[in-house]
Amino acid sequence: MLADAKPGTLPYISIQQIAVKKGGRKALYNESEENVVLDEYRKHVAERAAQGIVPKPLDASQMAALVELLKNPPAGEEEFLSDLLINRVPPGVDEAAYVKASFLAAIAKGETTSPLVTPEKAIELLGTMQGGYNIHPLIEALDNEKLAPIAAKALSNTLLMFDNFYDVEEKAKAGNPHAQQVMQSWANAEWYLNRPELAEKITVTVFKVTGETNTDDLSPAPDAWSRPDIPLHALAMLKNAREGIEPNEPGNVGPIKQIEALQAKGYPLAYVGDVVGTGSSRKSATNSVLWFMGDDIPYVPNKKGGGVVLGGKIAPIFFNTMEDAGALPIEVDVNNLNMGDVIDIYPYKGEVRNHETGELLAEFSLKTDVLLDEVRAGGRIPLIIGRGLTTKARESLGLPHSDVFRQAKDVAQSTRGFSLAQKMVGRACGVDGIRPGQYCEPKMTSVGSQDTTGPMTRDELKDLACLGFSADLVMQSFCHTAAYPKPVDVQTHHTLPDFIMNRGGVSLRPGDGIIHSWLNRMLLPDTVGTGGDSHTRFPIGISFPAGSRPVAVP
C-alpha cells in the first residue's frame, strides 16, 4: 500500500501505477483522455453542491491524474489545477499526500517539470503538508543552496518531525547553516510565536440549544456511516426538531437555513447550551459543530478548527476533544444568552458582554490558562508535540528550559499516600503517583479502536503522519457493523485492517467478536490504556475512554 511507504523513499508514481492499484477506469491509462478525470471531478463537485456541501478531497487516483495534467495543463485550466494541488489534497500520510509529495519532490530535484510549479514553489508546497511524506524532501533540500532557505522556513513551522528531528540535528552539527537555523527556530518556539495570540475580545453570534445537547444530537447514530465525511455528516446535526431549533428537513437535515441566517450577521457563531457534549460520539460531534462554527485550516480540505463553545456544563471528554481541535470551550452561566444575540467574550478577563450595550452578561474562569496556549497552537495535541520539539531542540543546543509556554498550576503538596489508580498513572508518567488536578502525559500501553470511530481515527493518524504505533498494543475491531454492514462499512472492513496492521497494530475481522472481550485478555497489570468507546473499562490496569483524536496519539 502507498500508505506503508516510509518518508525518505519517494519514487515517482505514474498515473498508470495508481490506476492499476486502485482498479481505475480505462481513462486513467490514456494520457489523451485525462480531461475525463476533470469532467468526472466536476460532476462530483456539482453533485455535492446540490447537497449544499463541498467536494471530497482528492484520492490517490485523482491525484495521480492531476500530476499528469499539471505537467501539461490544458489551456484555461491552470488556476483550477493549481487550486486542486494546493488546497484539495489531505496532509500527512494519506495515500494522495504520498503522490503529491513524490511529485513535488521530483520537481524540486529536477526529475520532472510543470509549467505551474517551479522547484521553489514545490518546496513551499511541501512545507504546507504538515508531516509524513513531505519531510525527507524538505530535509534533502537543506543541502541545495537555492532551495535551502525555503526548506528551512518550511521545517521551522513543521511539528510532526518525530525521528526525522535527528536528521536535521545531524546536518546542523555537521555545519549546515540552514539546518542550524531550523534547530534554533524550534528552540525559540517560533512555530508557536508566529501564530497570532488569542484576541483580547472575541465577538460572536449566539447559536443556543436549550437544555442538554447529547453528542447523538450533534452526530446521530443512524448517520454514523458518514462520520468520516465531515461536511456530509454535519448536515445531520440537530436534524430532529426541538425548542428553538428549526431543521431544514426534520429527521434528515438540520437547521442549515437557521445557521446561515445567523451567519449573515457577519460574526462567527458560538455554540451555546445549558449542558453540552454528553454521550459517546465526541469527535464526530465536534467535527459537526466546528464545520459550521469553526475556522478553515489552510491547505487542509474538509476540516475545520478553532471555534467557541459556551456551556453551563461541558462534558469532560467533549471538552477535551474541543481542546484538541483548537477550540475555546468555556463553562459559564448561559442563562442570559439567547439565540441570535451578538456578544463579546473577553477570555483574559473572564467576561461575556452584550456587543451593543456592553452589559455584563456572565463571568467565568478558564479551566486552565494553558487553554490559551492550546488555542494559539491550533489545539492541545499540536501544543504537546510542539513543546516536545522545542524541548528536544533546546537540549540539543545546550539551552535552558523554554519559558515561552504557560505551565499547568502545581497541585498542593500532600503527605498522604496514593490510591492504586494514582500509582498506575504515576508509573506511566515515570513518578510515584499523580494527584488530582496534576498535569501529566502518561505512556499508553494498550489502545482499542472500534469500527464506528475507526475510520475517523484512521484520518487522525494520517493527519498526525503516523507510520507506526508507539503503544505496545493497538487493536481494531468491527463489532458494531459486522452484523448489518452498509456499503461504506464493507469498504471499511476491506481497507482498515491493513492500515492498522501495517503500523504494527492488531486487527480483528468482522465476526470475530466484541473488542472488549479480546482487548481484556491482552492487558498488562498496572498499565494505562485508552479506547475510542465511551465504555472502555479495563479489568486489569486502568483505562481512560477518549475521542478519535486522542486515541490516535498513542
Predicted regions and their residues:
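Structural detector for internal amphipathic alpha-helices that build alpha-solenoid repeat scaffolds
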Residues: 51-56, 79-95, 109, 116-131, ...
